[in-house]
Amino acid sequence: DWAGTETILDGIDDSINGNIDIIETGITIDNVHTSFLVKTKEPMFTASEGTTVRILIDSDNNQNTGYYYPGIGADHLVEVYGEETGTVSSAMLYGFDNSRGKDDWNGFFSLTNIKANSTSAKGISTAIELQIANFDIGIDAGDGLKYLITASDLSGNMDITNVIDLSRNEYTYDESVSDRREITNSFRKGQLDGIDIDGEFTDWNS
């Protein structure tokens, strides 16, 4: 049912574990649900120690709310876990408590279970699809949305996509850090001595 939906390709072999090497992602939104597709190089839920797929969702497209990761403020988190059998063991949606620090991972709290499936008619699949009720993540079509996807194993290996928006534009980690720095430094331009606190040091040479 994802046929005809435009997806985004991710780099192959950027993780040493093919089970968590994300190679393709997709998103589609209708009036009721937001659905995600995640494909990996090899079947993801086949390791005995378990595999976790997480999606950080900036539901209001505002970096100043939610958990901060360069490029987004994650208001919601999806966590899908599976092991050995090739099937999903658990799939949970979390919200973020904005009274907590923006770098506090424990600020996420559980909201509800969600639908997720990693199997196909032919057996174990290299893809999972999941679906979230729009009401649960408070989507406003006028605000847009950004997200990123991670896949990790218990050995510490991880693959992370770029930040992606609904127009399928991608924002790399380095670009997002640079943009954030420019915004911050714009408030620290030197008025008297000509020194700008911007991380560039050429103005000290004059």
PLM regions and their residue ranges:
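A broad structural signal for short, well-ordered beta-strand segments within beta-sheet-rich domains
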Residues: W2, G11-E24, T34, W204
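Beta-strand-rich interaction surfaces with strong enrichment in secreted/lumenal proteins
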Residues: I23-I27, I114-S120, N185
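Extracellular/luminal beta-rich ligand-recognition
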Residues: D1-D13, T46-I124
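Acidic/polar low-complexity flexible segments
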Residues: D1, L56-E83, G123-S125, N134-N205
